[in-house]
Amino acid sequence: VSDLEKLAERAEQASGPRPELDATIWLNVVATPEQVKTVEAGRKAHGDTEARFRVERMMDGVRYTASLDAAMTLVPDGWHIDLRDYADSRAPLAGLKQMGVASVKQADLLAVVGSGETLALALAAAALRAHAALRDSGRQPQAENAAGG
């Protein structure tokens, strides 16, 4: 199982926004090699607190697990998004949770799915799986940065 698939599973299991998961997603999908080097240099020189500070500063407040708009930026170019929100006023009475399901599909019919407590979490999971599929198929470099999966 790839690092990106593990991140997708973490997004699906989250019960709400997770800043530490946002940071890990950013490092694995969005960060440039130079940004990853800056974070690692901070970690080596000053520890994990400095590394987290550097990531937070470079991310500029983006929260993939909290914001549907932010999660949409993770979807690879040319992929289509389908979102389903299974929020139901009867769900708590039946012991069910609210659930979002997201699928992203490429024109050549490669499709992946994610689910989560919110649509942002579901879409983040699906987008991570899309990146993993691209890397596995050789259409995206295996590791765009030092933190890649």
Where are these regions (language model features)?
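Glycine-rich anion-binding surface patch
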Residues: 1-121, 125-149
